[in-house]
Amino acid sequence: TPCGTLFPYTTLFRSLGLFLSIIVHELSHSLVARNFGMPIKGITLFIFGGVAEMNDEPPSAKSEFFMAIAGPLASIIIGGIFFLVNVTGQAIMPEPAGAVIQYLALINFVLAGFNLLPAFPLDGGRVFRSILWAWKKNLKWATRISSRIGTGFGVLLIVLGGLSFFGGNIVGGIWWVLIGFFMLSASRMSYQQLLLRKALEGEQIGRAHV
């Protein structure tokens, strides 16, 4: 039967759909960044999205805001499409196909929600930094505040992952700990890179005046 044929491939289709959803999420960042003249050096992917690596800081708070919000908006749109497909086609879809569609709708909403957390360098953290930047007109200060929040969030994930691990959820606990360490490292590194760029800019300006 069609259902029996689809069941063995359900996990494969879910995994493929998740991977493609993350790719679209990150490509949305890249397209908006290119529109603002910001080249993307690379993208680091992980289970709940990714982090775009740029050669330089965004030219303005406005450009960072739109680049950061593009990914979550893309995920919300994709999730909405899968949700509508599930609602309208539930009566005629085979059960395994319906399960995959439901999963992809849910995972895209989760992807958007997680990335909108105000923890730098997640998308939400970049949105928050752009708001602070626009408010104080000080990128260094905005990055320092956002980076501290990102660091705190990383520590929180590590603690929750440890509790989950010792509570019996071994795989889930390990995932949260790994993501927490990634967040911790990325948030600190982002601020250090900004300080280095500012120092190099100051050195170049000093040499130009010699």
What is the predicted function of each stretch?
Residues 6-209:
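Hydrophobic transmembrane alpha-helices and their immediate loop junctions
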